[in-house]
Amino acid sequence: MSRHICWICKLCRDESKRLPSNLTLDEVLKWAQSLESLMATKYGPIVYTAYLKLEHSDENIKFWMACETYKKIASRRGRISRAKKLYNIYIQPQSPREINIDSTTREAIIKSIREPTQTCFEEAQKIVYMHMEMDSYPRFLKSEMYQQLLKTVQSQSS
């Protein structure tokens, strides 16, 4: 991902007008339709994560993406291992990347951590998604990063 962030940072600092050749105006405009639309595109999650990283608030997107990966783990052993990692990084109080969830949701995860199901983080993931949708996503659309990227893509497509 660092390779992608590099072109994003250069663009935002106005040092580069080069974008990935397959980043289209259509894709960048889709990002403004909804967070769901942004997350369904190739570069949307990369750019959004870079923005959140600049804001020092990328724990929500990282947790959300980690949950998407977690849900695909079929083996019990793999699920237990990954669930413990997710707990230690994002759920445990005072953890380095602790996400903002209510105590009921946190307690439900703590109870299920020994025998985690594929859906044990689902409620926390929904809460985090709602936080992004209502808070950081609207800020992203107004950000200099998004506006500069949109302007550059528009100028290259005309």
From Swiss-Prot:
Entry GO terms, CC: cytosol; nucleus; plasma membrane
One protein family per Pfam: RGS
Biological processes, Gene Ontology terms: G protein-coupled receptor signaling pathway; negative regulation of G protein-coupled receptor signaling pathway
InterPro entries per the UniProt record, alphabetical: RGS, RGS_sf, RGS_subdom1/3, RGS_subdomain_2
Keyword set, alphabetical order: Signal transduction inhibitor
Domain RGS: 34-150
Domain of life: Eukaryota
Its biological purpose: Inhibits signal transduction by increasing the GTPase activity of G protein alpha subunits thereby driving them into their inactive GDP-bound form. Binds to both G(i)-alpha and G(q)-alpha.
Protein name: Regulator of G-protein signaling 13
UniProt organism field: Mus musculus
Classification lineage: Eukaryota, Metazoa, Chordata, Craniata, Vertebrata
